[in-house]
């Protein structure tokens, strides 16, 4: 995230901390360094009185008067996962509520070999039955997990890419009394607007562009019917300047086929001399 985003977030965490509201954060794959040369970003919260963090790629128990949070952050090394899960199981208390917090994929065995993925082992899913609630992060959509009645992904509270534009965003309110009650709270977030500029008739297409609905929006601009030479003459800044009040503008270039049926993907595979 940008410095501006980090600064804004810290101001909100300071407000929560000042109100003496306990707040627990666990590290995900994007906030976990892949080498020992980097420092975990969540370390900045160590000196906050009411913010508890778990980021060292190991199990951490966070205990209160009537509840224990069993936290398992993202793990880069799957070989260490079993020991950490067993530590978690050993700390389950029968006299308190037990909430498990993890950043991983549950039930997605097909991702086992993907770089940067931590997949929770299926032979340890029986531990979920010993928990009052299992709160998961990593996947960006809300949903229950498989046959488990107490295991949920809350999803992200904001879209993290344009591929996420159709998904509802929100958060979970979990109530642990006699039985678990899960309520999903949908929130209104900034819209994603898709605009198209036909580069066969660039000036007229720009003149007819409707930007009235792009204030504070995430905008995706499709430049269609591009040629290789024509694309060079349309810098990204020129297009982004058309949307001065948008929160973010991304540009997708769609090249039309040339007479010899070569496309953009072909350009990446041959030399410029051969292409032209």
Task: Enumerate the language-model features and the residues they cover.
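A short helix->loop->beta-strand "cap" motif at the edges of active sites that frequently abuts
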Residues: 18-23, 96, 130-132, 149
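Accessory, non-catalytic peripheral segments of nucleic-acid enzymes
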Residues: 177-276
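Active-site environment of divalent metal-dependent phosphoester hydrolases
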Residues: 25-37, 60-62, 76-79, 105-110, ...
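Divalent metal-coordination and catalytic microenvironments
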Residues: 9, 28, 69, 103, ...
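Active-site-proximal segments of metal-dependent phosphoesterases and phosphodiesterases across multiple
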Residues: 6, 76-82, 92-131, 162
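Conserved beta-sheet core of the metallophosphoesterase superfamily
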Residues: 112-180
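Active-site-proximal beta-strand elements of phosphoester/diester hydrolases
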Residues: 66-76, 98-105, 151-155
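Core catalytic region of metal-dependent phosphoesterases/phosphodiesterases
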Residues: 1-60, 127
